[in-house]
């Protein structure tokens, strides 16, 4: 990596290892506009918004694709460059669906933001765009090609982070579009509904499917009893929209808000995560006893499960048969509320608040539909719940604290960290290790399972067996690891896979935020774990009692599922 000094707008700026001039400029405190630049993705250099002028040669080039050189002198805001950027914005707006007030991305749209920043009030160019059909076939996301500015962010995140390549460029010149191969609907592809394309989309071209209307109809229907479960990652992200720092746990305020909105009962998905930990640990120990099959994969991430079904079905025998915490809660609610519904003539309507768009797909899976109704009637993302609170005028910071309802509102610290990368694997290790001391907990926390590294490896000894563990962020990295396992280069007993970077805290349904926000959310979950009344799933008295009451056969019926090749 290069080291040196360059002049940026007359200011001396030292650089040491920055991969491009854009990074050096931002280091100098200048926020260069971009559409197509994400530091975690390859450099594309298509939008040309980040162009700079070399004061020595007069040459204009994209700073994202320029390597910094010692002695460079560049200008970022000359009259020539400002005119250049305004023209780009005008051209984009001329071929853009500008129904901004009704757009799902309004207020979070990069094109809208930069048009305001650069004072673009008039568009001098004619509207020559074609009108394309909106693709609403996916259970998780909606694709509107009429709002696409061809920045390529969705193409690269799908290929580089997830290794899926569902979206790509098609045609040439003025006919250029982003679409699935052969212009298929998303539902006709092998899309896993992770929603990361929507998370990086700079406009409203790809958005998470909005189901707020369905939620309000249920809440206002007197014949329905609306019960809600809240996932761990939601509590450390929802506050960001109301002035709380990323990572602050606002669960008790969110419970109050939901009750004010008309929800009857509010529970915590950590209750289901404790069920998952115990069931998955028992399954893992049984595999150790019987010699496999290994590796055993975690099954909490529905996008990961979908990927194996579509792309690597030979590994379906390796995936845990445990349902995700959301679906375990769904099955338990279906069982527990049946008699109550019959007695009072109401129908229990179950909503799950999740950080994840793939949960919308999971809730609609036939394995989780019984007697014509899904175990989870509706999945709302964190952003959808934020929108609902803002619609009602609720100010989260002004609310009193109210804990989730019992008995389904009690969860362990191990369950809370399900929301961050490595959390599921750590929860299983906590349960399986015979040593239950505080010192053992500290040792587990430094095994190497935590953090956002693409692939993390750790080992722990149980009895006479040294267990090999791995934690994977992103499907592209999972593919790499599977290839090494296939080739005999790697062996593991347990592998946790989360499709989203950083785990559920980085889910596509979370508030739009920087990478640092995701890291702080993960830190917030670990702080909540530290403060938890009990740290292990088997210490949850409600879960232990219910499992004893159900018995082994009924537990297996409610908590386990099998998957098949698609």
Regions found by a protein language model. Name each.
Residues 5, 12, 16-83, 209-566:
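Iron-sulfur-associated redox domains of electron-transfer enzymes in respiratory
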Residues 5-8, 97, 130, 139-141, ...:
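A short, structure-level motif marking secondary-structure boundaries and short turns
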Residues 48-193, 199, 206-221, 225:
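Fe-S ferredoxin-like electron-transfer domains
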Residues 10-12, 101, 134, 187, ...:
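A generic secondary-structure micro-motif detector
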């Amino acid at each position: 990596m290069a080291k040196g000094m360059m002049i940026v707008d007359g200011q001396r700026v030292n650089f040491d290892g920055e991969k491009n001039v854009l990074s050096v400029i931002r280091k100098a405190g200048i926020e260069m506009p971009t559409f197509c630049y994400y530091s975690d993705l390859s450099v594309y250099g298509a939008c040309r918004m980040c162009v700079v002028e070399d004061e020595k040669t007069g040459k204009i080039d994209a700073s994202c694709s320029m390597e910094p050189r010692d002695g460079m002198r560049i200008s970022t805001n000359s009259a020539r460059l400002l005119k250049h950027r305004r023209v780009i914005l005008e051209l984009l707006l001329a071929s853009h669906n500008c129904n901004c007030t009704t757009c799902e991305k309004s207020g979070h749209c990069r094109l809208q933001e930069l048009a305001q920043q650069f004072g673009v009030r008039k568009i001098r160019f004619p509207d020559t765009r074609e009108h394309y059909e909106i693709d609403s076939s996916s259970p998780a996301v909606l694709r509107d090609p009429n709002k696409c500015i061809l920045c390529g962010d969705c193409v690269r995140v799908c290929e580089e982070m997830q290794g899926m390549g569902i979206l790509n460029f098609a045609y040439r010149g003025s006919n250029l579009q982003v679409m699935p191969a052969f212009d298929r609907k998303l539902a006709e592809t092998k899309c896993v509904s992770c929603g990361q394309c929507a998370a990086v989309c700079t406009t409203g071209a790809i958005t998470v499917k909005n189901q707020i209307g369905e939620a309000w109809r249920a809440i206002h229907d007197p014949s329905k009893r609306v019960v809600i479960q809240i996932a761990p990652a939601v509590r450390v992200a929802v506050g960001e929209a109301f002035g709380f720092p990323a990572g602050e746990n606002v669960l008790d305020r969110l419970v109050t808000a939901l009750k004010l909105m008309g929800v009857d009962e509010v529970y915590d998905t950590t209750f289901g995560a404790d069920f998952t930990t115990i069931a998955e640990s028992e399954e893992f120990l049984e595999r150790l006893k019987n010699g496999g099959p290994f590796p055993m994969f975690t099954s909490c991430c529905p996008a990961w499960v979908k990927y194996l079904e579509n792309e690597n079905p030979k590994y379906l025998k390796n995936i845990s048969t445990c349902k995700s915490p959301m679906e375990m809660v769904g099955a338990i609610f279906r069982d527990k509320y049946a008699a109550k519904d019959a007695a009072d003539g109401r129908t229990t309507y179950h909503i799950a608040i999740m950080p994840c768009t793939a949960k919308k797909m999971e809730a609609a899976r036939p394995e989780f539909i019984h007697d014509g109704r899904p175990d989870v009637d509706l999945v709302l993302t964190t952003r959808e719940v934020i929108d609902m609170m803002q619609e009602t005028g609720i100010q989260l910071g002004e609310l009193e604290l109210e804990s989730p309802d019992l008995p389904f509102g009690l969860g362990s610290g191990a369950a809370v960290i399900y929301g961050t990368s490595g959390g599921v694997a750590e929860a299983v290790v906590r349960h399986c290790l015979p040593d239950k001391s505080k010192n053992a907990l500290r040792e587990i926390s430094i095994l190497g399972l935590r953090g956002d590294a693409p692939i993390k490896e750790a080992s722990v000894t149980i009895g006479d067996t040294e267990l090999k563990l791995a934690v994977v962020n992103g499907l592209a990295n999972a593919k790499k690891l599977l290839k090494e396992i296939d080739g005999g280069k790697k062996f593991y007993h347990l592998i946790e896979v989360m499709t989203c970077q950083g785990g559920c805290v980085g889910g596509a349904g979370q508030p739009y935020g920087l990478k640092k926000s995701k890291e702080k959310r993960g830190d917030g979950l670990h702080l909540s774990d530290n403060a938890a009344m009990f740290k292990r799933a088997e210490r949850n008295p409600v879960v232990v009692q219910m499992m004893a009451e159900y018995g082994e056969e009924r537990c297996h019926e409610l908590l386990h599922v099998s998957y098949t090749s698609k």
